[in-house]
Design a protein with these regions (language model features):
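Bacterial N-terminal signal peptides
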Residues: 15-25
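Small/polar, glycine/serine/threonine/aspartate-rich low-complexity segments that form flexible
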Residues: 33-50, 91-130, 244-257, 299-336
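Amphipathic alpha-helical coiled-coil segments
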Residues: 67-82, 139, 146, 150-175, ...
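Bacterial Sec-pathway N-terminal export signals of envelope proteins
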Residues: 29-95, 119, 127, 193-196, ...
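Hydrophobic/aromatic residues within transmembrane alpha-helices of membrane transport systems
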Residues: 58, 115, 161, 227, ...
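A glycine-/polar-enriched beta->alpha junction
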Residues: 56-66, 73-88, 102, 113-131, ...
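Periplasmic alpha-helical coiled-coil/stalk elements that build and connect Gram-negative outer-membrane
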Residues: 2, 7-8, 146-271, 362-365, ...
Length: 441
């Protein structure tokens, strides 16, 4: 009886020690902070987006930039050609043999030299000079648009990198949760056959999560290698914020997006290289139409010539003016240019309308997304607390493994959704700042 009592007391002590161990382990199994609404505002020292100097250095090495410079140099020559115009001086040399029929005179030789040049009328000259100025302005607008396009392309590449970071963080989170659950199941395996089955299931979950984490990290490393080839000067040692305070610090850092949509719309349209380029192209078409209309009155040509006739016995000096007779094709070309100009105006209006609506939609998404972010993080905090309590209940035998897995998966899903929405808002804000001229200029 004494031996049986000692065995019973030892079993009770072991159960008590095991219970205390499980409770302590479960309280530390998940270290994510409990969140309240007072913790959702804050600052962050994490900077996910490269600095202006880093972006400038990265883009300076892009082949597309060199191609843009070459194209702009060609447009400078195009402007010079427009200033000069297709006006050339023509040299005419002639020689003829004169053989009289009814005369005793011998054969004589006539020689002539003439110069002729088309004259550009003064109103056409003014249009050509304005057209050349428009070409140079268009070249500057194309350069600005090309630089903006490079920055937007860079943002898309960086977006891919950050999404791989997000995938890795999601896999890390799942792996950590699976590890904590397996530890709890391992501590309960002595309770019987069902507890051992739970331990095996938890171990399988942990191995699967670990494999997913390895795959996520390999995809991230592959993306880094891809971007290093294109942007070798950039550093990729970055990690995502994991708390709402850090995310709100990033979203509220440095630049404040305009809250007045009408003001933001005006700023967007006024400084957009795309709109400026469309306006300058319309200006060019207008000048082209005006030039073609003026060409219905052809340019005259002025020439001078000297000649020697009868083997030098006679000298002739003369001046001549020639004016082409305009044909029907000039009037048709003028009407065609007017139609092209009207089409350009309509396309410009459509472009501006599309840009205005796109900006309003993105600004609205930013404002509404920012409002939705706080309750999303709060929802995650509640689900996370429920998952932790469910794990404690599992340690006490109050919850099944299936219930714990379900609670943890819901909490992890809420965490990933909050993290993903935070990242997408940061990318949305960065794109808006880029388009409004507030970033990477």
């Amino acid at each position: 009886m004494i031996k049986e009592s000692m065995h019973k007391r030892a079993g009770q002590v072991f159960s008590l020690v095991w219970l205390v161990t499980v409770l302590v382990t479960s309280s530390h199994a998940h270290t994510e902070p409990r969140l309240g609404m007072d913790k959702l505002q804050g600052t962050s020292s994490i900077e996910l987006m490269p600095s202006e100097a880093e972006v400038r250095a990265a883009l300076a090495q892009q082949p597309k930039l060199a191609a843009t410079k070459a194209r702009l140099a060609g447009q400078g020559q195009e402007a010079l050609l427009r200033r000069l115009g297709p006006y050339e001086t023509h040299l005419a040399l002639g020689q003829q043999h004169r053989r009289p029929r009814m005369s005793v005179e011998s054969v004589s030789i006539d020689r002539s030299l003439g110069l002729e040049r088309s004259l550009r009328l003064w109103d056409k000259l003014a249009v050509d000079q304005a057209w050349a100025d428009a070409i140079e302005s268009r070249a500057n607008a194309e350069r600005a648009l090309s630089e903006l396009s490079l920055r937007q392309q860079f943002l898309e590449h960086w977006r891919g990198f950050l999404r791989e970071l997000l995938a890795e963080e999601a896999a890390r989170r799942t792996a950590a949760s699976s590890e904590a659950l397996w530890i709890q199941a391992q501590a309960r395996r002595r309770l019987g056959e069902l507890a051992q089955v739970d331990e095996q299931t938890a171990k399988a979950e942990q191995l699967q999560a670990f494999a997913d984490l390895i795959e996520a990290r390999s995809r991230k490393l592959a993306k880094i290698e891809q971007l290093k080839k294109r942007y070798p000067v950039l550093g990729f040692d970055r990690s995502l914020p994991t708390t709402p305070a850090q995310w709100f610090g990033l979203l509220n850092a440095v630049q404040k997006l305009p809250t007045d949509i009408d003001r933001a719309e005006h700023q967007y349209i006024e400084q957009s290289p795309l709109v400026l380029l469309a306006k300058l192209q319309g200006l060019e078409l207008g000048l082209q139409a005006k030039r073609i209309d003026l060409d219905q009155r052809p340019d005259p040509s002025l020439g001078a010539f000297v000649s020697q006739e009868r083997s030098g016995a006679e000298h002739v000096i003369g001046v001549q003016v020639s004016i082409p007779i305009a044909g029907q094709q000039r009037a048709v070309a003028a009407k065609l240019a007017v139609h092209q100009l009207e089409e350009s105006f309509s396309l410009n209006e459509e472009l501006i309308l599309e840009m205005r609506s796109d900006l309003r939609a993105r600004l609205s998404s930013w404002q509404q997304g920012l409002l939705a972010l706080k309750p999303r993080w709060e929802a995650y905090a509640l689900h996370d607390e429920a998952a932790v309590r469910s794990l404690r209940g599992f340690a006490l035998g109050e919850r099944s493994l299936t219930e714990v897995l379900q609670a943890r998966r819901v909490a992890d899903l809420q965490y990933i959704q909050a993290l993903s929405q935070s990242l997408e808002l940061l990318l949305l804000k960065t794109g808006l700042e880029l388009d409004l001229g507030l970033r990477w200029q």
